[in-house]
Amino acid sequence: MHAVRYTQAFIPTLKEAPADAQVASHKLLVRAGFIRQLGAGIYDYLPLAKRSLTKIEAIVREEMNAIGGQEFFLPALHPAEIWKESGRWEVMGDNMFRLKDRKGGDYGLGMTHEEIFTAIARDELRSYRQLPQVWYQIQTKFRDEPRPKSGLLRVRQFTMKDAYSFDVDRAGLDKSYEDQRQAYEKIFTRCGLDFVAVQAHSGSMGGSESSEFMVRTDAGEDLVAACPRCRYAANTETATSRVAAEADGPGLAAPEKFPTPGVVTIEALEQAPHSVPARRQLKTLVYMADERPVIAVVRGDQELNEAKLQTATGAQVVRPAHAEEIPPLMGAHAGSLGAVRFTRARVVVDPSLADRKDMVTGANEDGFHLRGVDVRRDLLAHGATLAELRTVKAGEGCPRCDGALEVFKALEVGHIFKLGTKYSESMKATVLDAGGKQVPIVMGSYGIGVERILAAAIELHHDDNGIVFPMAIAPFHATVLTLGPEPELRKAAEEVVAALGKEGVEVLFDDRDERAGVKFKDADLLGIPIRVAVGKKGLAAGNVEWKLRRGGAVELVPLGEVARKAAEAVRAATT
């Protein structure tokens, strides 16, 4: 195997990280010469990054092929018409890069490829006998991120492995989904990631069920609620919990209005002279679900989770109502709102409030509130419905056992979806089943962010000196360097490099005319798993210095054994 010489390689290391780099992976990828920024959320991948990304793609490809996946390569440029068939041309909004051709035709740059793969299935699949099918690609995607940041964690151009399964029924989908789940676990394990699979919100993808694969790191932007006792885990967009029951008084026979001039926040109502604890207040929020008003009600000290509201309403898009949209509907401004006996829009109440009595809420009249509200009597009896709305908090009870939930930041590296017939119905992709009936194809969608795996691995595996790469995705397995300018050291190092190459070990040969300290620092920064140093004293005894990047002590290894030792280390870490 051919070694790469440092003097011929392009490895533009830096002593300092960019001032705008906040997370470890961003700092180290720039300092170690893996990436450079071209624009906001747009990066050049330099040779070291390309080597690691190619290895990640190879692992993904192997595991996809192992479950019967067939690789495609589809266009990144999509005509608008195909996205309009599924209804997502409008739903994607500003997140999609859009352009017109010279004839005025509308196009989008693909964020994902459900529509394109569904169109192929519609045009080519005719019978249940052709199913199941598992199709995938590793392709460039585009997303117009409003706030690109954190290096490779939030970008506008990225590489995704997106796979799609096509089955004749739900049972087939269940099997395809499980196959993908197991393949994902193998991929992330091989890439050196410590991950957890969690229940997740499907968002604009749609479908009945989805799971995210999360890496626990403070660099993540998602929040996961997990129980250390029973291993329940879910994104806070879907997580549920047990909350302690409140001992309410009997309340009043009917809600009673009282003046609250200038009181427009939960916190203000907690203060004297009213002194109403937040847990006894009903927080009433006005949202637009697919541009239709919906009223969400949670406890005063709880936060509404917009993803849960989207699930509860079945809407494609939810947003807070604008300030000017609220008074015509509610009769008051924000801060004085309530849902007591309200029937002008759909009202959704969090289940934790179902049996609450003697509550306080806005009176839908500026400067007034209502006390003595009985949720069941005054809201549910008038058409309000129950649905999970609140965001769970750390310390609340696990919904599956007696344990307490912890909540932590996490980074999503993969997401799998049971799409069902969402796309096949809207795009009329059907096959004949065994009974001769035309049925919509049952689909699944499965995505992995390739660059995110690289960044996540670095977030998990680094120290004060640099990257500590897992062997399977390191740009090189080993680096060989000399500890002096003497010709005999160079000659011995060349022999070591050649022996390593014969054993299939990928080598970066640091042949620079630099001090040993500089070479050691760069080796640590680059994170190459094995370091072999050839020095005058060791060579006189027939030895070289051996050190593992992951916390290993320096060992003396006989010159003739180092290649075998390295090959064994590589095999042990990659098989």
UniProtKB/Swiss-Prot annotation:
A single GO BP term for this record reads: prolyl-tRNA aminoacylation
Report which reactions are catalysed by this protein.
Answer: tRNA(Pro) + L-proline + ATP = L-prolyl-tRNA(Pro) + AMP + diphosphate
The EC class name is: ligase
Keywords (A to Z) from UniProt: Aminoacyl-tRNA synthetase, ATP-binding, Cytoplasm, Ligase, Nucleotide-binding, Protein biosynthesis
Under Gene3D superfamilies, the record lists: Anticodon-binding domain (3.40.50.800), Bira Bifunctional Protein, Domain 2 (3.30.930.10), YbaK/aminoacyl-tRNA synthetase-associated domain (3.90.960.10)
Keyword set includes Ion transport: no
One of the entry's Gene Ontology molecular-function terms is: aminoacyl-tRNA deacylase activity
**Listed InterPro entries:** aa-tRNA-synt_IIb, aa-tRNA-synth_II, aa-tRNA-synth_II/BPL/LPL, Anticodon-bd, Anticodon-bd_dom_sf, Pro-tRNA-ligase_IIa, Pro-tRNA-synth_IIa_bac-type, Pro-tRNA-Synthase_IIa_type1
Pfam families assigned:
HGTP_anticodon, tRNA-synt_2b, tRNA_edit
Q: Name one GO cellular component term.
A: cytosol
Q: Which domain of life is it from?
A: Bacteria
Compartments where found:
Cytoplasm
EC no. given is 6.1.1.15
Instruction: Please explain the role this protein plays, according to its UniProt record.
Output: Catalyzes the attachment of proline to tRNA(Pro) in a two-step reaction: proline is first activated by ATP to form Pro-AMP and then transferred to the acceptor end of tRNA(Pro). As ProRS can inadvertently accommodate and process non-cognate amino acids such as alanine and cysteine, to avoid such errors it has two additional distinct editing activities against alanine. One activity is designated as 'pretransfer' editing and involves the tRNA(Pro)-independent hydrolysis of activated Ala-AMP.
Q: Which family does it belong to?
A: Belongs to the class-II aminoacyl-tRNA synthetase family. ProS type 1 subfamily.
Comment, domains: Consists of three domains: the N-terminal catalytic domain, the editing domain and the C-terminal anticodon-binding domain.
Q: How does it assemble?
A: Homodimer.
What is the name of this protein?
Proline--tRNA ligase 1
